[in-house]
Swiss-Prot record:
One of its GO terms (biological process) is protein ubiquitination. Gene3D superfamilies: Potassium Channel Kv1.1, Chain A. Pathway: Protein modification; protein ubiquitination. This is Putative BTB/POZ domain-containing protein At2g05330. The keyword Iron-sulfur does not apply. The BTB/POZ domain mediates the interaction with some component of ubiquitin ligase complexes. The keyword Lipid biosynthesis does not apply. It comes from Arabidopsis thaliana. Pfam families: BTB. May act as a substrate-specific adapter of an E3 ubiquitin-protein ligase complex (CUL3-RBX1-BTB) which mediates the ubiquitination and subsequent proteasomal degradation of target proteins. Residues 17-87 form the BTB domain. Keywords: Ubl conjugation pathway.
Protein backbone atom coordinates (compact mmCIF):
# COMPACT_ATOMS: atom_id res chain seq x y z
CA UNK A 1 0.00 0.00 0.00
CA UNK A 2 1.37 3.41 -0.97
CA UNK A 3 2.36 5.74 1.83
CA UNK A 4 0.01 8.69 2.22
CA UNK A 5 1.77 12.05 1.91
CA UNK A 6 1.10 15.04 4.15
CA UNK A 7 -0.65 16.70 1.23
CA UNK A 8 -2.91 13.67 0.66
CA UNK A 9 -3.70 13.53 4.36
CA UNK A 10 -4.51 17.23 4.41
CA UNK A 11 -6.76 17.02 1.34
CA UNK A 12 -8.64 14.14 2.91
CA UNK A 13 -9.24 16.15 6.07
CA UNK A 14 -10.45 19.10 4.00
CA UNK A 15 -12.91 16.85 2.18
CA UNK A 16 -14.28 15.44 5.43
CA UNK A 17 -14.54 18.94 6.93
CA UNK A 18 -16.52 20.13 3.92
CA UNK A 19 -18.92 17.18 4.09
CA UNK A 20 -19.44 17.53 7.83
CA UNK A 21 -19.83 21.26 8.45
CA UNK A 22 -19.94 22.86 5.00
CA UNK A 23 -16.75 24.84 5.39
CA UNK A 24 -13.07 24.09 5.05
CA UNK A 25 -10.84 24.21 8.10
CA UNK A 26 -7.61 22.75 9.30
CA UNK A 27 -5.46 23.27 12.35
CA UNK A 28 -2.47 20.94 12.68
CA UNK A 29 0.76 22.50 13.93
CA UNK A 30 2.57 21.48 10.74
CA UNK A 31 -0.07 23.15 8.60
CA UNK A 32 0.08 26.34 10.68
CA UNK A 33 3.86 26.59 10.31
CA UNK A 34 3.68 25.91 6.57
CA UNK A 35 0.92 28.48 5.98
CA UNK A 36 2.70 31.13 8.05
CA UNK A 37 5.94 30.63 6.13
CA UNK A 38 4.22 31.17 2.76
CA UNK A 39 2.03 34.17 3.58
CA UNK A 40 2.57 37.22 5.76
CA UNK A 41 -1.19 37.76 5.92
CA UNK A 42 -1.87 34.22 7.12
CA UNK A 43 0.99 34.55 9.59
CA UNK A 44 -0.70 37.60 11.14
CA UNK A 45 -4.02 35.75 11.29
CA UNK A 46 -2.40 32.75 12.96
CA UNK A 47 -0.64 34.97 15.50
CA UNK A 48 -3.75 36.98 16.38
CA UNK A 49 -5.31 36.75 19.84
CA UNK A 50 -8.64 35.80 18.28
CA UNK A 51 -7.05 32.76 16.65
CA UNK A 52 -5.18 31.72 19.78
CA UNK A 53 -8.14 32.08 22.14
CA UNK A 54 -10.93 30.74 19.96
CA UNK A 55 -13.33 29.01 22.32
CA UNK A 56 -14.82 26.50 19.93
CA UNK A 57 -11.96 25.60 17.61
CA UNK A 58 -8.62 26.29 19.21
CA UNK A 59 -5.84 26.50 16.62
CA UNK A 60 -8.12 26.42 13.59
CA UNK A 61 -8.25 28.88 10.71
CA UNK A 62 -11.19 28.94 8.31
CA UNK A 63 -10.98 29.96 4.64
CA UNK A 64 -14.54 30.47 3.45
CA UNK A 65 -13.89 32.31 0.18
CA UNK A 66 -12.68 29.22 -1.68
CA UNK A 67 -14.63 26.16 -2.72
CA UNK A 68 -13.38 22.69 -1.85
CA UNK A 69 -11.49 21.99 -5.08
CA UNK A 70 -10.03 25.50 -5.13
CA UNK A 71 -8.74 25.16 -1.58
CA UNK A 72 -7.25 21.74 -2.31
CA UNK A 73 -5.43 23.26 -5.29
CA UNK A 74 -4.31 26.14 -3.06
CA UNK A 75 -2.88 23.69 -0.54
CA UNK A 76 -1.23 21.67 -3.31
CA UNK A 77 0.67 24.76 -4.39
CA UNK A 78 1.68 25.62 -0.82
CA UNK A 79 3.14 22.14 -0.42
CA UNK A 80 5.01 22.38 -3.74
CA UNK A 81 8.36 24.04 -4.41
CA UNK A 82 6.53 26.92 -6.09
CA UNK A 83 8.39 26.61 -9.38
CA UNK A 84 5.32 25.91 -11.53
CA UNK A 85 1.59 25.25 -11.46
CA UNK A 86 0.27 21.72 -11.66
CA UNK A 87 -2.60 20.91 -14.03
CA UNK A 88 -4.97 20.87 -11.06
CA UNK A 89 -3.88 24.30 -9.88
CA UNK A 90 -4.15 25.69 -13.43
CA UNK A 91 -7.83 24.71 -13.51
CA UNK A 92 -8.47 27.18 -10.69
CA UNK A 93 -6.06 29.92 -11.77
CA UNK A 94 -8.61 32.71 -11.50
CA UNK A 95 -9.75 31.83 -7.96
CA UNK A 96 -6.17 31.26 -6.82
CA UNK A 97 -5.08 34.55 -8.40
CA UNK A 98 -7.56 36.29 -6.11
CA UNK A 99 -6.49 34.22 -3.11
CA UNK A 100 -2.83 34.90 -3.82
CA UNK A 101 -3.53 38.62 -3.83
CA UNK A 102 -5.58 38.47 -0.62
CA UNK A 103 -2.98 36.45 1.27
CA UNK A 104 0.02 38.12 -0.40
CA UNK A 105 1.52 34.97 -1.91
CA UNK A 106 3.44 36.72 -4.66
CA UNK A 107 4.82 33.66 -6.45
CA UNK A 108 1.37 32.09 -6.76
CA UNK A 109 -0.02 35.38 -8.05
CA UNK A 110 2.72 35.64 -10.68
CA UNK A 111 2.17 32.08 -11.90
CA UNK A 112 -1.62 32.43 -11.96
CA UNK A 113 -1.30 35.72 -13.85
CA UNK A 114 0.88 34.04 -16.49
CA UNK A 115 -1.64 31.20 -16.80
CA UNK A 116 -4.52 33.65 -17.21
CA UNK A 117 -2.66 35.63 -19.86
CA UNK A 118 -1.85 32.45 -21.80
CA UNK A 119 -5.54 31.52 -21.72
CA UNK A 120 -6.82 34.85 -23.10
CA UNK A 121 -9.49 34.37 -25.75
CA UNK A 122 -12.49 36.15 -27.22
CA UNK A 123 -14.85 35.00 -24.47
CA UNK A 124 -12.79 35.69 -21.35
CA UNK A 125 -10.69 38.74 -22.24
CA UNK A 126 -13.23 41.25 -20.91
CA UNK A 127 -13.59 39.32 -17.65
CA UNK A 128 -9.83 39.19 -17.20
CA UNK A 129 -9.57 42.90 -17.94
CA UNK A 130 -12.07 43.49 -15.15
CA UNK A 131 -10.20 41.11 -12.85
CA UNK A 132 -7.06 43.20 -13.33
CA UNK A 133 -8.68 46.38 -12.00
CA UNK A 134 -9.10 45.67 -8.26
CA UNK A 135 -6.43 45.70 -7.13
CA UNK A 136 -4.89 47.09 -10.29
CA UNK A 137 -2.51 44.68 -12.01
CA UNK A 138 -0.79 46.50 -14.86
CA UNK A 139 0.65 43.37 -16.46
CA UNK A 140 -2.69 41.55 -16.65
CA UNK A 141 -4.52 44.75 -17.56
CA UNK A 142 -2.18 45.53 -20.46
CA UNK A 143 -2.26 41.94 -21.73
CA UNK A 144 -6.06 41.78 -21.70
CA UNK A 145 -6.46 45.22 -23.26
CA UNK A 146 -3.90 44.42 -25.95
CA UNK A 147 -5.76 41.20 -26.79
CA UNK A 148 -9.06 43.06 -27.01
CA UNK A 149 -7.56 45.69 -29.30
CA UNK A 150 -6.14 43.15 -31.75
CA UNK A 151 -8.63 40.27 -31.69
CA UNK A 152 -12.30 39.56 -32.06
CA UNK A 153 -14.22 40.10 -28.82
CA UNK A 154 -17.30 38.16 -27.81
CA UNK A 155 -19.29 40.41 -25.50
CA UNK A 156 -21.00 38.86 -22.47
CA UNK A 157 -24.70 39.34 -21.79
CA UNK A 158 -26.15 42.84 -21.97
CA UNK A 159 -26.52 43.03 -18.18
CA UNK A 160 -22.90 41.98 -17.61
CA UNK A 161 -21.57 44.48 -20.11
CA UNK A 162 -23.77 47.24 -18.68
CA UNK A 163 -22.32 46.52 -15.24
CA UNK A 164 -18.82 46.70 -16.73
CA UNK A 165 -19.67 50.08 -18.31
CA UNK A 166 -21.05 51.38 -15.01
CA UNK A 167 -17.99 50.26 -13.05
CA UNK A 168 -15.30 51.14 -15.60
CA UNK A 169 -16.65 53.79 -18.00
CA UNK A 170 -13.24 54.84 -19.33
CA UNK A 171 -12.22 51.25 -20.01
CA UNK A 172 -15.57 50.59 -21.68
CA UNK A 173 -15.00 53.49 -24.08
CA UNK A 174 -11.54 52.13 -24.91
CA UNK A 175 -12.96 48.65 -25.52
CA UNK A 176 -15.74 49.96 -27.77
CA UNK A 177 -13.33 52.15 -29.75
CA UNK A 178 -11.09 49.13 -30.29
CA UNK A 179 -14.05 47.12 -31.56
CA UNK A 180 -15.08 49.86 -33.99
CA UNK A 181 -11.62 50.52 -35.42
CA UNK A 182 -10.33 46.94 -35.57
CA UNK A 183 -9.43 45.54 -38.99
CA UNK A 184 -11.99 42.89 -40.03
CA UNK A 185 -10.83 39.34 -39.39
CA UNK A 186 -11.90 35.93 -40.51
CA UNK A 187 -11.34 32.27 -39.81
CA UNK A 188 -8.66 30.78 -42.04
CA UNK A 189 -10.00 27.90 -44.11
CA UNK A 190 -6.65 26.11 -43.87
CA UNK A 191 -5.45 26.46 -40.27
CA UNK A 192 -8.79 27.42 -38.69
CA UNK A 193 -7.25 30.28 -36.73
CA UNK A 194 -9.28 33.43 -36.32
CA UNK A 195 -6.69 35.87 -37.53
CA UNK A 196 -6.10 38.96 -39.56
CA UNK A 197 -5.15 39.16 -43.20
CA UNK A 198 -1.68 40.45 -43.87
CA UNK A 199 -1.04 43.90 -45.28
CA UNK A 200 -2.19 42.88 -48.77
CA UNK A 201 -5.41 41.48 -47.41
CA UNK A 202 -5.02 38.33 -49.51
CA UNK A 203 -3.39 35.76 -47.22
CA UNK A 204 -3.52 34.45 -43.66
CA UNK A 205 -0.85 36.08 -41.52
CA UNK A 206 -0.50 32.82 -39.59
CA UNK A 207 -0.12 30.06 -42.17
CA UNK A 208 0.22 32.16 -45.34
CA UNK A 209 -2.76 30.60 -47.12
CA UNK A 210 -3.77 32.76 -50.11
CA UNK A 211 -7.31 34.09 -50.30
CA UNK A 212 -9.04 35.36 -53.42
CA UNK A 213 -8.75 39.12 -53.68
CA UNK A 214 -11.83 41.06 -52.67
CA UNK A 215 -13.52 42.96 -55.46
Amino acid sequence: MATQTNQDHFSGDLRRSWQKIGKLTYGSRQWIVMMASRSAVLKKMLESDEFKTSAKQVGTITLLEMKQEELEAFVEFLYSDGSMLSSKVKQHARALYRAADKYEILRLRELCRSELISSLNSTNSLNLLELAQIPFDKVLNDAALSYIKTNELMFPSFDEFKLFVDNYPNLAVEVMMASLTRTPSTSCSRCGLITYHNQTGTSCCSCGFDYPRRS
